């Protein structure tokens, strides 16, 4: 019988990412999960020989990823982490995930990471991480083909776009090879400085054009606090913009992540329904998998 991890109502921090991160409305571009991700297939994104992107193969590499997560989420963003071990960001899902890391070949330092929960692992655990924040009942029909992304972060000194680009190319290559056409994740909008005004305004701005059909909508377990006023939202954070350009849908209202003082927007990307220019790139990755 599968061991079920009962979803706690403790939220995480900001993606797809994160998927996972937090800051004020005037400093969104400094957020690690919102490093520019314009086109993971573009020709000029040639391999950066200083950086190596790979799936972690041993515990030391996974520990390095957890230390990076702690430095970004706790030290930089002030999140309240409850992993139980000082200096590490970890939870009960980590043991069941594949961990993608980017290392600097000149130093050996891990400078970027993402984690991926595959459908088979989610079945063993009994839930996805997103189940701790949302009621995912309406996604049950696609769960056998749905992988979940999260805990993404990049070292502050490497936020040029190369790290996140390399990770996304590998994530897409892997998911194509493994037959995971649906990618579930969250993009996070900070609430620390404005109490949620930006998050509410983004929801009102984006829901009319980017909300998934009712059959795929999910519901937050902890909704955002109500507001007496809002404002015209600026452009969405870069990571969210990238997802939307690739055809991702917002699955419902954001959840309130108390630990990270942030709003998590649930998003779903269907690799079989990408815009034409992305489909061409995906076909290139598919040939690489043959």
Language-model regions: role of each:
Residues 41-111, 115-120:
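Short amphipathic alpha-helix that is part of the acyltransferase structural core
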Residues 109, 275-279:
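Short, conserved charged micro-motifs
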Residues 90-91, 197-201, 265-269:
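Short low-complexity, flexible loop/linker segments enriched in glycine and/or proline
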Residues 260-274:
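C-terminal "cap" of GNAT-fold acetyltransferases
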Residues 285-290:
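Short, cationic low-complexity segments
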Residues 119-248, 254-255, 261-262:
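Acyl-donor binding region in acyl/amide transferases
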Residues 2-59:
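Conserved N-terminal entry element of GNAT/NAT acetyltransferase domains
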Residues 84-93, 191-192, 257-264:
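Beta-rich nucleic-acid/ligand-interaction surfaces
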